[in-house]
Amino acid sequence: MYILENKNQPTPIEETTFADLNMLERDIEEMLRLNIDMLCETDEESMLIVGQQVRNEQNGRSDLTAIDNSGNIVLIEVKRDVNDIANRKEPFEFQAIRYAASCATLKSTSELVQNLFAPYVEKHRSEFTKEQNLTATEIATRKLDEFIKQCNITEFNEHQKIVLVASGFDEQTISAVAWLNSNKVDISCYQIFPYRLNDEILIYIKKIIPI
């Protein structure tokens, strides 16, 4: 990759790794939490983060949970690189499927607020300074209602979506996700690449499945 400073002088951009940048999985997760539009492919798409590190019935933790502009619950699982995927006790995609199954039981926006969004707001209370006189439940309800109105959402959680994010994927994950897609499971893989340009770090995100 190059940056074109003038017509005849392209400057190469150095590809690096999150490990070389001393960035951990939680750092990537936090970057996406605060900038979730990085995973939206078009201007028409949008997501609202409603949960982080949410525990399911098996005591597992999902990285990020969102609602999209169609009212679907989106489970976002993050791994730093292929090594992190390989070192897991269970396949990357199976972990996300279990979390999606637990979110499928949410039948109303009030359940979403009570079980996920209000605890998330409480955890990140410092980010909601304009609503400091409201309870976490009141803030979550207001933010969710605003998002639903803005996106003209008429259905809630009719479908669940899974998004896997990593700087690289192993063949097992790629094959499994491709098969799940062919069997109508809404699951996507996004590859995230860090680049270094002088003292700046550039991030490039590419959807690799489905194409």
What does each of the following model-derived ranges do?
Residues M1-I211:
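Charged, terminal alpha-helix-loop-beta segments
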